Amino acid sequence: GSAPPGDPVEGKHLFHTICILCHTDIKGRNKVGPSLYGVVGRHSGIEPGYNYSEANIKSGIVWTPDVLFKYIEHPQKIVPGTKMGYPGQPDPQKRADIIAYLETLK
């Protein structure tokens, strides 16, 4: 299904309680996972200074809101072999909120 409207304020809270374990929202600052600053609209596997999995590099994905909505639900299903260990967020509203926040990071 398609994403419900997201709330970037709630998304920021979710990012800073869930995503922050492996990612940052700061340009150029990678952790276990790559920085998600500017991720919306970016091609997968290209954040400088991050050692991506071959699966992510070769996926050919562009991180549109729709793709992120599906990926955050089932990362391993969308990019089999991804290093992302997060099992996924089943709640569509939480996914939409996180994406709404990611869209503000530019």
From Swiss-Prot:
GO terms for biological process: photosynthesis. Pfam families: Cytochrom_C. Keywords: Electron transport, Heme, Iron, Metal-binding, Photosynthesis, Transport. SUPFAM superfamilies: Cytochrome c. InterPro entries: Cyt_c-like_dom, Cyt_c-like_dom_sf, Cyt_c_1A/1B. Heme c binds at residues 19, 22-23, 84. Binds 1 heme c group covalently per subunit. Signal peptide: none annotated. PROSITE patterns: CYTC. One of its GO terms (molecular function) is electron transfer activity. Belongs to the cytochrome c family. PANTHER family: CYTOCHROME C. This is Cytochrome c2.
